[in-house]
């Protein structure tokens, strides 16, 4: 162990508070001093090393805590990846460990370097001239992961294949006019061009794909729709802690996952009852279905191959968020170890959500109604051509909802006039919108009235015709306890209304119900790729809609921690082989949501939002409707 620099004094932060700017700076300094890295070294991430659950649950405000930073560092000269843990209270390097056989994500700093070296390469310049492009500044070069499809003599290299786009005028749609067939291959560690592949000239698509308001004729503005709360919002914020109605939770943000929710609890009477310990995006992967050129390689892991959280948007009032808004800022470290302040990257506000419940009693001619309101916590991320909104909704009745909003621009392939597009669709002259999918995996570390939980699969069951079903209408429900990890890979069965309950068998209400929540999936798909395809070897988690594992603080990502260039490393399919018991223990559920995107002309030049998600609803958690005490609205005739 090594000591360096001055220890940092933190004013009694909560154990889950993200690292401050000074903490991040200290962590970087300590690592650099110990490892003697030169200026070419890169920091993939530096984040809070979250304490063990017990220390979080027993934390008392004002007490001192041990603060630790976790970092992933790339020594580009040696092509070695290291994990570091820094104790911030006494400025000590706890560990600095080489992790053999893995590669880090590609970083924004490398993308900028890559642009410069590719544009100076004579073979690239010559390839552009063959396509009639003389001005190198009219070309955007974007790196794409090679996945597990590298050439045999390049498998030892950390490298990338770049795709190019013609941007005739500043501000044009970057992705509307692909420069097809010209592919620079770049060694990222050495930052040199290995070669420039040219499979032949395809005409540049003619349509610039304008979508900016300053370049189009727009209709008159919509009539004003003002959202006001004269008395202010109902939520209270203390640092990263939020209290809204009966909900309490904490906001977090990490470089890879982006938005994280911690320690969600619901106040029932005089008790704050835990529901979820940690909720986060585990992975987002986008495989394409076109076999042309090198597009068959495209299946980007947006967390595993890029730094998802670093590509977050700064949100704007009136555009991204409406109403009485509270924003959260976070600090992150860039690839060179410099602290960057990210402003307004998490937005929180309330929304009216229509009717919560209503009944008109005809006999007494009396009507009761309550209006629903939800708390919205959201972030938006831009990963190349795609934009993703991650939204968490909390409702007055204890419901939790996750929603992903998919928008941005299509990733396109230029085609010859009259060329057939069996693996996509013609969305504009000369461009094929390639068929693809999006797979989200959400990690939910459940904590229903504590950590000892059990997952139960529930579905409807028809009773066979006979003495027990004389009228043919009888059906009941069937419950199956998921007892061990080997049985923890589960699939939807919409024909039977299948869902999953997470229950605490030691917490029972007066009706005999175990306290629980049920996961209600939304629309979903099965993988389109062949089981033995390169993509499926790396993304085995997409094979099942739900996975259940025993809690392990090191298992945060469905395909494993290090995805870049791997053939298919540790991840959910491997973890469940441990066959750990799952009854009355600390369990994690992982929900995979798949979206099939068959592009259409209406997706060009920019895509209207597609919505996907799931819902968690209390089941037996309360003894009756928990919103009976909600004040009625003021009604007007």
Say what each PLM segment does:
Residues 15-57, 107-150:
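Short, non-transmembrane alpha-helical segments in secretory-pathway proteins
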Residues 37-89, 135-187, 245-247, 377:
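Exposed beta-strand-loop-beta-strand "reactive/processing" segments of non-cytosolic proteins
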